[in-house]
Amino acid sequence: MSITAERKTALIAEHARTEGDTGSAEVQVAILSERIANLTEHFKTHKKDNHSRRGLLMMVSQRRSLLDHLKKSDLGRYSALIEKLGLRR
């Protein structure tokens, strides 16, 4: 269900704005999107796992907040990230 350290490192390298950047909104949204995708696959076989579903909803909410912040502060970065991750917006 969780992402591997190698995959997380690859996501950070792909979306980082500078070397060693792990806290920017782009990196955080990319990691959350990966975790959301993994949990979505999990729910295809475990439909009654409501405990994990709550975690999924919290992750979606956190990602939405980060995207709203990014949209408000820098529309260009927001648009590029949405296109790169293939999110509907």
Curated annotation (Swiss-Prot):
A GO molecular-function annotation: structural constituent of ribosome
Domain of life: Bacteria
GO biological process, one term: translation
Xref: InterPro entries: Ribosomal_uS15, Ribosomal_uS15_bac-type, uS15_NS1_RNA-bd_sf
Coiled-coil positions: none
GO cellular component, one term: cytosolic small ribosomal subunit
Keywords: Ribonucleoprotein, Ribosomal protein, RNA-binding, rRNA-binding
Functional description taken from the UniProt entry: One of the primary rRNA binding proteins, it binds directly to 16S rRNA where it helps nucleate assembly of the platform of the 30S subunit by binding and bridging several RNA helices of the 16S rRNA.
Subunit structure, as described in the record: Part of the 30S ribosomal subunit. Forms a bridge to the 50S subunit in the 70S ribosome, contacting the 23S rRNA.
Family, per entry: Belongs to the universal ribosomal protein uS15 family.
Protein name in the entry: Small ribosomal subunit protein uS15
Organism, scientific name: Caulobacter sp. (strain K31)
The gene coding this protein: rpsO
